[in-house]
């Protein structure tokens, strides 16, 4: 499959992936039901800006929640954050069933690549695959998030090279399992043409500003097409 064909396929999937859930979200009371979205991951979805400051209401789960409600005003929707700062996907996988799937989510997002550089590609893939398969087995839709950028971009060092490769790993997993992809890494790339541009989107060594969180929320929200 060519790159163009992949992009077309991804675009079509973005339109249809959540169809059954979006149809339910369009229903009015008393025919509607509660829809649960779980955001699982590390410090970024947890809302950390300049550590130890946590800016919950400027982080992408809350921004996403507002975007969803603007598009689906009749839906009762919970966006539940199960993210913990400092975690890798190994940590997140160990508590995935207990902390994330216990909410019986209709949709779960997974965001760990920034920290997964500490564990390497093989262990990261095993942990991500385990979480994906557990979610899909229970009928939960999955949207994977590629990493947001960090200050390794300025250095263009091994840390940056690893981040690029982890982003590609997440894309590969989304393609392998035919699930959703929120390409945060690509969204940052579209808005940053020179090093000084990153200051608008980076609040800390490796945490986005609100503007950076908006980019992530928009990537996820592309699956929530208003009816």
What would you call each of these model-derived segments?
Residues 7-82, 95-104:
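Serine-esterase "nucleophile elbow" of acetyl-processing enzymes
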Residues 12, 22, 148-227:
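Catalytic His-Asp segment of secreted/periplasmic serine-dependent ester chemistry enzymes
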Residues 36-38, 69, 74-103, 115-145:
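Internal alpha/beta domain cores that form substrate/cofactor-binding pockets in large enzymes
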Residues 44, 52, 81-87, 109-117, ...:
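Cell-envelope and extracellular/periplasmic
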Residues 46-50, 88-90, 116-119, 151-156:
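A short acidic, helix-capping loop that chelates divalent metal ions and anchors anionic groups
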Residues 52-59, 122-123, 127, 158-165, ...:
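Alpha-helix N-cap and loop-to-helix initiation/capping positions
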Residues 63-71, 99, 130, 134, ...:
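Alpha-helical structural signal in soluble globular domains
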Residues 111-115, 131-167:
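Active-site segments of SGNH/GDSL-like serine hydrolases
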């Amino acid at each position: 499959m060519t790159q163009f064909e992949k992009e077309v396929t991804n675009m079509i999937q973005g339109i249809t992936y959540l169809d059954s859930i979006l149809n339910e979200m369009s229903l009015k009371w008393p025919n509607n039901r509660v829809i649960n979205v779980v955001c699982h991951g590390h410090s970024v979805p947890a809302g950390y800006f300049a550590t130890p400051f946590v800016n919950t209401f400027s982080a992408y789960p809350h921004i996403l929640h507002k975007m969803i409600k603007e598009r689906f005003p009749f839906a009762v929707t919970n966006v539940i954050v199960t993210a913990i700062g400092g975690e890798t996907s190994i940590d997140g996988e160990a508590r995935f069933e207990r902390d994330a799937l216990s909410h019986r989510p209709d949709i779960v997002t997974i965001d760990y690549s920034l920290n997964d550089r500490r564990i390497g590609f093989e262990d990261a893939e095993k942990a991500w695959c385990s979480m994906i398969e557990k979610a899909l087995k229970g009928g939960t839709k999955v949207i994977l998030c590629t990493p947001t950028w960090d200050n390794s971009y300025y250095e263009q060092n091994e840390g940056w090279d690893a981040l690029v490769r982890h982003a590609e790993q997440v894309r590969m997993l989304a393609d392998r399992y035919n699930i959703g992809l929120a390409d945060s890494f690509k969204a940052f790339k579209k808005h940053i043409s020179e090093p000084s541009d990153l200051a608008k989107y980076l609040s800390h060594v490796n945490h986005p500003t609100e503007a950076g969180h908006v980019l992530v929320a928009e990537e996820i929200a592309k699956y929530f097409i208003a009816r």
